[in-house]
């Protein structure tokens, strides 16, 4: 049963995408994933029992998180292409974007971030299919050891012996991840890497300092540009407010609000 009240019946197991396509005739490109019985899932998820389904777009918070999570994987794939010796740790979606923590031999300077963005654009253009598979703990450990990803190996070792571990692939890139993700990399049309900071592994200052790269992502360039403009305007207002409160400067209408007058503290 879909969230608009319509019901689709099938004698055989069927994917969310195929069920929606059969019911509605087509599935909008704006649909990113689905809530199946309240849990976010890929559109490729196969339904084999009675389920409540809500199709998710970027307007839904759950849809935003799936979109941003896939953007984080695209960023990680770009980093691995450019700097193959880099090791990955975590890369979640956040309330405003996404980040990835890397153990890298090079420093992610603003210039390097621009190079990563350029490689991300190539990955989006390649429109790589994102595929999920489930492995046993032993098989997942073997895979991550083969890929020389020690942080992923450590994470798997912490899981129960009978754990079913999901792996995602897009082209040559493979990652340990709970998901869910978009159908392909081509859906992430607009993104920007915003900054790089230091972050201790697992948030413990006794562990190694990693590099955390932050980014934002949107379905369209217009939405990205609008968000960036809003953030820049908010930053200007913050500087204006702080400067006045600290008595660094003031303005007077007779001179013009755009011409600050420096005060003794400024």
Place the predicted regions along the sequence by residue.
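Ubiquitin-like/PB1-type beta-grasp interaction modules and other compact soluble beta-rich domains
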Residues: 1-72, 76-79, 83-94, 118-122
